[in-house]
């Protein structure tokens, strides 16, 4: 029956065309000829839709409907780290074969718009990881439909999709991601509808040369894949495209890394100030600690609240530890300075001089010599004894204290051994940390994790 109907359509169309050609002259087609062509294709479309049921898929009960797809990306981006999503603008193409739409006519391809698409069966394709999808309708629905004479259809539409992009931020901001775009049939299992890529994997998804709309990422490329997803209603074919992104580090070097490095260097300037400069060293320590706190808070604002530490978090934490250690170092030096002992073993408190004993002893507000003489009484009795008494009288002598070699006085510009050690140890350790940090993360291969789709 299908063959007879197709043959009658073919003969009828050619009869009309030959009848119009019999009276035409060579040159531009007349208005009557154009009107006749319009009538021919109108009749063809009417006959195609006569008895057509768009509720039934092609090959129902006979075969599996194969839908071939490919994607042309006109715009990719932006990518939101906070919401873990990206936006993509595509021309989404689907092709399948419907024997009910075979025709014979003067043209091998019927080029139609969206009005015809609503009257025939089309795949119920949806995006598994799409948060919001928009079909453009200005000024008319951006849809294209082409029907070839053997019943093969090409259905193209322009879509803007906002899709999920699971991100693993352990290496942030030296991280890389594979953002998936997953689509498939919503109602038909793989026993009814299967999806295939139209071309080889390298050409099935193409990004326009000027299609990147990314400020913080580089689009490295894309890969395609397909798989089967098991759900409670059956097994479904899922087509997946991964867009591989690598983050640009320049913004974060300027906004976070350089300020952190400069803050650590500034905190180490206090080691070169003398230990008696308490106000200056206190200002250095407190200011740098507060600066690091502000930098750590601002660096986290642009990221989602993840439960693990990122590479930037580790860098900020180590810088914070260096700054805080510099403040503790000054507190330690100041503590020993106040106690009067420097770490070089010299006393800061000067030694008090010893008192010289006075040979006179004060008694009852009068001074008396330590050796009492009774010369006047003896002189009255015997002049000889008086002479002996005078000679026996001990005259007091001044006792001089023992002299010790003077110790070198402590100057106000003295340097503690802790400061001397810190001037070398802190910059050396911070330089080693930076060398290990940047060598580790910059040479690490991107870990692109693509979770298995599910429904």
Swiss-Prot record:
GO CC annotation terms, alphabetical: chloride channel complex; cytoplasmic vesicle membrane; dendritic spine; GABA-A receptor complex; GABA-ergic synapse; plasma membrane; postsynaptic specialization membrane
Signal peptide span: 1-27
InterPro entries: GABAA/Glycine_rcpt, GABAAa_rcpt, GABBAa1_rcpt, Gabra-1-6_TM, GABRA1_ECD, Neur_chan_lig-bd, Neur_chan_lig-bd_sf, Neur_channel
Binding site for 4-aminobutanoate: 93, 156
Domain of life: Eukaryota
GO biological process, one term: chloride transmembrane transport
Chain segments annotated as coiled-coil in the UniProt record: none
Cysteine-cysteine disulfides: 165-179
Membrane-protein topology: Multi-pass membrane protein
Cytoplasmic side: 274-278, 333-420
Loss of function: phenotype: Gene knockdown in orbitofrontal prefrontal cortex results in an inability of mice to select actions based on their consequences, developing instead habit-like behavioral inflexibility.
MF terms (GO), sorted A to Z: GABA-A receptor activity; GABA-gated chloride ion channel activity; transmitter-gated monoatomic ion channel activity involved in regulation of postsynaptic membrane potential
Protein's name according to its UniProt entry: Gamma-aminobutyric acid receptor subunit alpha-1
Source organism of this protein record: Mus musculus
């Amino acid at each position: 029956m299908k063959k007879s109907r197709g043959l009658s359509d073919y003969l009828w169309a050619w009869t009309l065309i030959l009848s119009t050609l019999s009276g035409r002259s060579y040159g531009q087609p007349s208005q009557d000829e154009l009107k006749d062509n319009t009538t021919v294709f109108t009749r063809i479309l009417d006959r195609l839709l006569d008895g057509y049921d768009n509720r039934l898929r092609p090959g129902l009960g006979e075969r599996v409907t194969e839908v071939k797809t490919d994607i042309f990306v006109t715009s990719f981006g932006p990518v939101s780290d906070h919401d873990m999503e990206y936006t993509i603008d595509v021309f989404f193409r689907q092709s399948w074969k419907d024997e009910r739409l075979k025709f014979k006519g003067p043209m091998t391809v019927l080029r139609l718009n969206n009005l015809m698409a609503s009257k025939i069966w089309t795949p119920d394709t949806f995006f598994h990881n799409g948060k919001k999808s928009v079909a453009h309708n200005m000024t008319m629905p951006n849809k294209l439909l082409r029907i070839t004479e053997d019943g093969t259809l090409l259905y193209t539409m322009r879509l803007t999709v906002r899709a999920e992009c699971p991100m693993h931020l352990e290496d942030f901001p030296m991280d890389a991601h594979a953002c998936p775009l997953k689509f498939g049939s919503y109602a038909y299992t793989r026993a009814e509808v299967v999806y295939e890529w139209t071309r080889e994997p390298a050409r099935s998804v193409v990004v326009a040369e000027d299609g990147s709309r990314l400020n913080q990422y580089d689009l490295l490329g894309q890969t395609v894949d397909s798989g089967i997803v098991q759900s409670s209603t059956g097994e479904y074919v899922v087509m997946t495209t991964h867009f591989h992104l690598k983050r640009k580090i320049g913004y974060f070097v300027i906004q976070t890394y350089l300020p952190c490095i400069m803050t650590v260097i500034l905190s180490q300037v206090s080691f070169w100030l003398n230990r008696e400069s308490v106000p200056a060293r206190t200002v250095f320590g407190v200011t740098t600690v507060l600066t690091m706190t502000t930098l750590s808070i601002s660096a986290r604002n642009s990221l989602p609240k993840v439960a693990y530490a990122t590479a930037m978090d580790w860098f900020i934490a180590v810088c914070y530890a260096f700054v805080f250690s510099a403040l503790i170092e000054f507190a330690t030096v100041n503590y020993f300075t106040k106690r009067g002992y420097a770490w070089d073993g010299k006393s800061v408190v000067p030694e008090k001089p010893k008192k010289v004993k006075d040979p006179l002893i004060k008694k009852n507000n009068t001074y008396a010599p330590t050796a009492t003489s009774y010369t006047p009484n003896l002189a009255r009795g015997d002049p000889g004894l008086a002479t002996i008494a005078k000679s026996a009288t001990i005259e007091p002598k001044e006792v001089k204290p023992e002299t010790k070699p003077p110790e070198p006085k402590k100057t106000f510009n003295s340097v503690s051994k802790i400061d001397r050690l810190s001037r070398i140890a802190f910059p050396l350790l911070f330089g080693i940390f930076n060398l290990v940090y940047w060598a580790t993360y910059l040479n690490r291969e991107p870990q692109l994790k693509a979770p298995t789709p599910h429904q």
